[in-house]
Amino acid sequence: MKIIKFTESGNKSKRCFIAMSFSPEATEIRDAIKEVLYKLGFIPILIDEVHYESDITINDALIAEIKKCKFMVADFTEHKYGVYFEAGYALGLKRPVIYTCKKDDFSKTHFDTNHYPHIIYTNADELKEKLKNKIEAWIL
């Protein structure tokens, strides 16, 4: 069994876990979220960009990273099941979750989450502005 050490977690952390689609179509949105986080002094964590030893499963890594984060940005565009799981896990840990979704996809989001306030956006620039404002008001 591999034990993952936590150096910082929760309120003291500068880490933000990003849960979203890894599709090529999501690259612009991924980059927009990362840009905002960096500008506000946070470290964006995307599970597909973190390297782990071979004996750590992606699920163990994912859970460890969510535990270490101060908050999460969960983008429900493309409706990936993993995003729903990751956001729910973060909520269970009492981590703030900022919900985002592209306007054209929002009507397809699951009823268990679509009643939470979402940042609805039409393009990356709009997302950057709204996300920056939300983090400044809600996290900083």
For each feature predicted by the language model, list its residue ranges.
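Conserved catalytic or regulatory cores that recognize and/or transform ribose-phosphate-containing ligands
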Residues: 1-140
